[in-house]
A protein has these predicted regions:
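Extended alpha-helical regions
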Residues: 1-8, 18, 25, 208-209, ...
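Active-site substrate-recognition segment that forms the wall
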Residues: 3-8, 16-59, 63-153
């Protein structure tokens, strides 16, 4: 249990107690709703899924006309992203559905594999050797946030990367650490990244908002 006190912060666990003057929340799409009142109702987790093929032969790459190692994505609203990996495997990713259960994961494995075969029909016989998914994090205004959450400047976060966390998360982690240690000033960051996180309207309905967005964007993509 995490408690905020006048002296600082106390984290109590079954293994012991930890005290700190400053806290950074860096859990992104895995941030629990009740972890902090400063984040309640302000974040929306969304699943993203990835499959990876066995290494492709040069003949297979030629058959599909694939000639680059540069990551790419398509122009859909519910986009797919993909790249050839250094060992010749092909990585293909996209949204991960709205069911976080194990059964939902298997259903979406089939769905994303179908999408992969639709876009790359020459590789329909390429075995899928890896599949995983996880949560990305969305903010109401679809912009990351870096900075303090409380008026005392003792609770900090770098959060809401909207599926771009591999690059943005690394950069943001360094940025929030520099703010906390006073090696940088808030004004040195773009005001777009340091504005206050706004709450979603009627935040209890966020799962429905996400499902509705998928239906709408899916219809737009089908036009």
């Amino acid at each position: 249990r995490w408690e905020e006190t006048a002296e600082g912060h106390v984290l109590r666990t079954a293994e012991g107690t930890l005290r700190a003057r400053q806290v950074i929340i860096a859990t992104n799409g895995y941030t629990e709703e009740n972890v902090s009142k400063h984040l309640a109702g302000r974040l929306m987790p969304a699943l993203s899924s990835i499959i990876v093929t066995r290494p492709l032969s040069e003949e297979e790459k030629r058959a599909q006309g694939w000639t680059t190692n540069i990551p790419a994505f398509d122009s859909r609203r519910l986009l797919h992203y993909f790249r050839l990996l250094p060992d010749g495997r092909f990585l293909f990713g996209g949204r991960g559905g709205t069911d976080a259960s194990n059964a939902g994961a298997e259903d979406y494995r089939r769905e994303i594999t179908r999408s992969f075969h639709d876009l790359f029909p020459a590789w329909k016989n390429a075995e899928i050797t890896h599949y995983w998914r996880g949560f990305v994090c969305l903010a109401h205004d679809l912009v990351p946030y870096i900075g303090a959450l409380d008026e005392r400047n003792t609770v900090w976060t770098a959060i809401a990367y909207h599926g771009n966390g591999v690059a943005m998360g690394s950069w943001s982690g360094r940025a929030v650490a520099r703010l906390l240690t006073k090696k940088a000033a808030r004004e040195e960051l773009s005001p777009v990244l340091t504005r206050r996180l706004s709450r979603f309207p009627l935040p209890a309905f966020r799962p429905l908002y996400l499902k509705g967005a998928y239906v709408w964007y899916g219809w737009e993509d089908s036009r």
